[in-house]
Amino acid sequence: MITLSTLKKYKKEGRKFSCLTCYDAMFAKMMQNAQVDTILIGDSLGMVVQGNDSTLPVTVEDIVYHTGNVSRSNKHALILADLPFMSYVTVEDAIANTRKVMQAGAQVIKLEGGAELSEMVTTLTKAGAPICVHLGLTPQSVNVFGGYKVQGKSDDAAAKLMSDVHAVVAAGASLILLECVPASLAKAVTEAVDVPVIGIGAGADTDGQVLVMHDMLGVTHGRTARFVHDFLTDERNQKSEYAGSVEGAFALFHNSVIEGSYPQAEHQFN
């Protein structure tokens, strides 16, 4: 079974780790069979499961429901879960909603934000809830950003992100997740902190890589993000012992991350 201690050990050893989003029991079981290291019950479910155009409508009850589905069916992966939009405005809200999600089976709680989360991170960590802080492109703030855009491109923005990372790590964050930032910035962050860093659209040098399950299976509509690769139709999966199955796509993703063949330069932002 993968734990936070396992991920910290992997970081020290230079061994990459895999992460996929998941929302139900059957896919969770397949991910266990494929040895995927970590699973995120993400508020991305608002878009890929519920059909919304953003993550904002997702509720705590939604996360609790899907976390239970996953945690009952996967006993291998470390399970992360989001607190959704406006569910942790106050420390009191954060404590109450963290309790609900962890009682459903989450082992790490993910929050979106920066240094302003420091007090909350410390409080939740002291209460026994490991925290992953999500920085860079944070989908819950899409209306503030004016759309889904690469973050940390200017010197000032990069310095601000690095400062935020140091603040939340000092406050007790157990993991960092960077989304859609230049690969060079993600590399600098990963080297600057002793906690594991997960990337999505953040280059190849982070400690772990995460993708939305539907994206990496090619189950998408409209424009596909630069960092997405379709592992289901990948020739390596088609020719593998899995014979092109979904479980094979999960295994190929996991192995590609560990071996360093994903992501490639074409998947990153400069």
Swiss-Prot record:
GO terms for molecular function: 3-methyl-2-oxobutanoate hydroxymethyltransferase activity; magnesium ion binding. Keywords: Cytoplasm, Magnesium, Metal-binding, Pantothenate biosynthesis, Transferase. The active site is at residue 179. Pathway: Cofactor biosynthesis; (R)-pantothenate biosynthesis; (R)-pantoate from 3-methyl-2-oxobutanoate: step 1/2. It catalyses: 3-methyl-2-oxobutanoate + (6R)-5,10-methylene-5,6,7,8-tetrahydrofolate + H2O = 2-dehydropantoate + (6S)-5,6,7,8-tetrahydrofolate. It is found in: Cytoplasm. InterPro entries: Pantoate_hydroxy_MeTrfase, Pyrv/PenolPyrv_kinase-like_dom, Pyrv_kinase-like_dom_sf. Its EC number is 2.1.2.11. Its cofactor is Mg(2+). 3-methyl-2-oxobutanoate binds at residues 43-44, 82, 110. The keyword Cytoplasm applies. Mg(2+) binds at residues 43, 82, 112. Homodecamer; pentamer of dimers. Belongs to the PanB family. This is 3-methyl-2-oxobutanoate hydroxymethyltransferase. It comes from Psychrobacter sp. (strain PRwf-1). The lineage of its organism: Bacteria, Pseudomonadati, Pseudomonadota, Gammaproteobacteria, Moraxellales. The gene is panB.
